Amino acid sequence: TPVCALTLASNRPGVCGRMARMQIEAHNDFAADPFATHAMLTDPAFLARVCVESGDVSHRVDAVADHSAVERQRHTPAAVRNFLGDTLTLLQDIRWRPAAADGARTGTLALTVKGMPAKADVAIDLRPGGRGTLVDFVGQFTIKVPFVGGKLEGQAAPALLEGFGVQQRVGDEWLAAG
């Protein structure tokens, strides 16, 4: 079974919940070499399929070999709908550095929620290993909302886990289809 693991560690300050912060650590393991895995992760059709499989209301994808930008509109979780409205717009920006001889490369993922003081800053490490290629995501997700930051953080955790899991599942299907 493919590995998709996510670790979240919360760091909430005690004063009115002004800032909620989650440490993100997620891993994907794909059955392809790093060159093929990177090509998949930057293919606009793959990125669009991840959006569809994630249940996005709508999405817009722009991707080339070293940069992808995805705008995703999603239904807001019921527990925070009163604070945020019916939908959220997520802006995902991934930038890749050049590959090493073995296809290994690093990159960054910046995720923001349009109109909210929430963001994820994540380092990406793509390298040979596992079933072919391991992709590690390590960073922080921060929400700066007085009084409700902790509640919003609690709603974000399952969505982050789901996102990395969907990427693993869609990636496995994509690679198996050849």
Residue ranges and their predicted role:
Residues 15-73, 84:
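Hydrophobic ligand-binding cavity/cleft-lining segments
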Residues 29-33, 74-76, 95-97, 112, ...:
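Solvent-exposed residues in well-ordered beta-strands and their adjoining turns
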Residues 55-64, 95-96, 121-128:
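Short amphipathic beta-strand and strand-loop transition segments with alternating hydrophobic
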Residues 104-158:
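Beta-strand/loop substructures that line and gate deep hydrophobic ligand-binding cavities in soluble
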Residues 95-98, 149-178:
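A conserved amphipathic terminal alpha-helix motif
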Residues 23-25, 87-93, 118-123:
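Short, surface-exposed coil-to-beta transition loops
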Residues 60-109:
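Glycine-rich portal/gate segments that line the openings of hydrophobic small-molecule binding cavities
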Residues 1-21:
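Short, Lys/Arg-enriched N-terminal segments with co-localized hydrophobic residues
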